[in-house]
């Protein structure tokens, strides 16, 4: 079985090829098609989950990049999937206006990269809210970080933009390292890094160290005080 994570990377390559191949003024519509397809699927699944109050298994594998893992949608993740889907479609539609005056100033490659990052951001966010295990979560978390970095770097000619992007990517990877430490610890104690095992860990192990590691890791992404140094940039 191919490691889960490889199909996502292949899909990302296909999406990138579609957006790059589209004519300059059609890139927004190519991106909208890519995002809307995923948004419709995610929204339909989410509505079914919310209406039925049940959990739907989306994927499962015994061979993830770091071990077995799975993804599912329960009522809470369904709510977030709906929010992400609506927001992503709205963002692509809005981009048609705010990128219009860049079409003659930026190269087609630059515009393509921006739209690829936008589509990648959407699918990575869906992966984040539906991952059952820590390692698949981190895979999508990192994909989301890289996509965000590229979006921030769109106006890279400006020094303040480069500085903001650098501050962001450094803080995000410090946070990623902390989360990785936390999930490795969970996996070493409980035999898996599934979120469902956090309760067992906190019942049987000293809770404060792991809590602090996760708080700092997630806090950096959220821009929580005092880990918000990248946010004003």
Protein language model annotation of sequence segments:
Residues 49-68, 103-106, 136, 143, ...:
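Juxtamembrane/interfacial segments at transmembrane-helix boundaries in multi-pass membrane proteins
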């Amino acid at each position: 079985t191919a490691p889960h994570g490889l199909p996502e990377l292949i899909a990302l390559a296909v999406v990138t090829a579609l957006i790059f191949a589209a004519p300059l003024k059609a890139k927004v519509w190519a991106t909208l098609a890519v995002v809307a397809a995923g948004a419709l699927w995610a929204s339909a699944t989410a509505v079914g989950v919310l209406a039925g109050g049940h959990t739907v298994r989306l994927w499962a594998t015994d061979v993830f990049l770091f071990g077995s893992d799975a993804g599912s949608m329960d009522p809470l993740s369904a709510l977030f999937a709906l929010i992400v889907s609506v927001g992503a479609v709205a963002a692509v539609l809005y981009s048609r206006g705010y990128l219009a005056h860049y079409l003659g100033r930026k190269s087609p490659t630059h515009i393509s990269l921006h739209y690829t990052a936008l589509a990648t951001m959407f699918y990575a966010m869906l992966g984040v809210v539906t991952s059952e295990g820590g390692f698949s979560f981190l895979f999508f978390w990192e994909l989301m970080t890289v996509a965000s970095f590229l979006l921030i770097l769109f106006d890279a000619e400006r020094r303040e933009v480069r500085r903001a992007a650098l501050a962001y990517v450094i803080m995000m990877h410090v946070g990623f390292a902390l989360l990785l430490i936390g999930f490795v610890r969970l996996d070493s104690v409980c035999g898996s890094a599934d979120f469902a095992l956090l309760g067992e860990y906190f019942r049987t192990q000293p809770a404060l160290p792991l809590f602090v590691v996760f708080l700092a890791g997630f806090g950096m992404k959220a821009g929580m005080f005092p880990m918000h140094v990248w946010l004003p940039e």
